[in-house]
Amino acid sequence: MSSSSREGSPDWLRSYEAPMTTSLLSLSSSDDDSPYRESEVISSLPLPDDDGDDIVVLETESVELLTRKNSETKVVTKQVSIEQVFSRKKKADASLNLEDSCAGKENGNNVDCEKLSSKHKDAQGGADSVWLVSSDSEPSSPIKQEVTVSTEKDADFVLEATEEEPAVKTVRKEKSPKTKSKSSRKTPKEGNSAQEILKTEDKDTDTTIAEQVTPEKSPKTKSKSSRKTPKEENCAQEILKTEDKDKDTDTDTIIAEEVTTDQKIKPSSGSSSRLPLVLSEKVNRTKVLVECEGDSIDLSGDMGAVGRVVVSDTTGDMYLDLKGTIYKSTIIPSRTFCVVNVGQTEAKIEAIMNDFIQLIPQSNVYEAETMVEGTLEGFTFESDDESNKNAKTAVKPADQSVGTEEETNTKAKPKAKAKGETVIGKKRGRPSKEKQPPAKKARNSAPKKPKAKK
């Protein structure tokens, strides 16, 4: 039997190897409910039909063949991927909601609730695959049917279970059994390609579900994220402090600048920066401002009349003689200005002028080297030497005898005076310092006379 059954089976059954995954199989011999259903069915999944009744997908081969050759002849079906539930807490909540919803249903639906709960437990343990064997009461044409379980979110899965809506959806039977059997047969290559496509679609759905789940966080996670660690709080406080310090420094600098400007504007008390300007009753118009080209006029230390003004009648020019240098002057009009004499207590305006004089040097007296010749007769001199010289020229020469007598008399008088002084000095005991200078005078005057004789 085994060899004949293998020979009768198609090629895709021979090349198939059973996957090492836990599978859920539902078996029956006919479309109608049979007495062997409860004993032989391991587990079944509810499938929605047009009438709304639960239909169990069964294999039409005989139960005896399947029981004898369970390991050899297994029909290849498309693996249905059940998406794994993301968090364990949500899995537990979903299982509790399933049990509560099943408790309120009738006895007829208890089997379905048990199936849903077992499938949910299997999904918690891992991504176990579900295998379904289906046929349309034809033993020669096994049919594969796609069964997709959509569990994008645990909450949606629980709502569907509580509202008595089946979680497992199948494609409705619209075609005839023959057309389905022909269209459902695929080569192994097509089966492998279909599995790869399903895997890629599962990956895409996983990524989309993950993207949907990430923005929708639970309030616990939001509260955790809103809670800051002490380090983060300290950093935030330090940032606020630095901002406050920067603001304070900015305000301090602005205030300091305002204070400095006020200090510059306000003069210090007791300073001589401000003086009252006094205008005399009569303004002096005799003062002149002079501008000199060339050599500067040095009037330092000079007092009194330093120069003279020469005005020619013919040309109408005015010449100014300053310390021997003659300057040609030209009057140039200008803006009104004043000469101010600044003192310790006040500033007094001494002159107001509307023009100034520009000087151009013409000639110098010292450069001309002029000589002046003449006699000094008739001039008297106060010095003794000059008076003696004048007397010598006027006195006539006298006799020699008279001159000798005068000389002897002049010599005898100082000797007698010297003897008297010594006697008086001894008697009185006083020094003779007072009478020594006249003796020197006599000595000095004695030699002058012989010079005059010569």
Curated annotation (Swiss-Prot):
Cited function: Component of the DNA topoisomerase VI complex. Binds to DNA. Required for chromatin organization and progression of endoreduplication cycles. The loss of BIN4 activates the ATM- and ATR-dependent DNA damage responses in postmitotic cells and induces the ectopic expression of the mitotic G2/M-specific cyclin B1;1 gene in non-dividing cells.
Oligomeric form and interacting partners: Interacts with TOP6A, RHL1 and itself, but not with TOP6B.
Keywords assigned by UniProt, alphabetized: DNA-binding, Nucleus
Deleted gene: phenotype: Plants show a severe dwarf phenotype. In bin4 mutants, a specific DNA damage repair checkpoint is activated preventing further progression of endoreplication cycles.
InterPro entries, per the entry: BIN4
Compositionally biased spans, kind Basic residues: 438-454
Region of interest (Disordered), ranges: 24-53, 103-249, 380-454
GO MF entries: double-stranded DNA binding
Listed Polar residues bias regions: 132-150
Xref: PANTHER family: DNA-BINDING PROTEIN BIN4
Membrane-spanning intervals of the chain: none
Annotated organism of origin: Arabidopsis thaliana (Mouse-ear cress)
Bias (Basic and acidic residues) ranges: 112-123, 229-249
Tissue specificity: Expressed in expanding cotyledons, vascular cells, elongating root cells, developing leaf trichomes, root and apical meristems and lateral root primordia.
Keyword Nucleus: yes
Places the protein is found: Nucleus
Protein's name according to its UniProt entry: DNA-binding protein BIN4
GO cellular component annotations of the record: DNA topoisomerase type II (double strand cut, ATP-hydrolyzing) complex; nucleus
GO terms under biological process: chromosome organization; DNA endoreduplication; epidermal cell differentiation; positive regulation of cell growth; root development; shoot system development; trichome morphogenesis
Signal sequence annotation: none
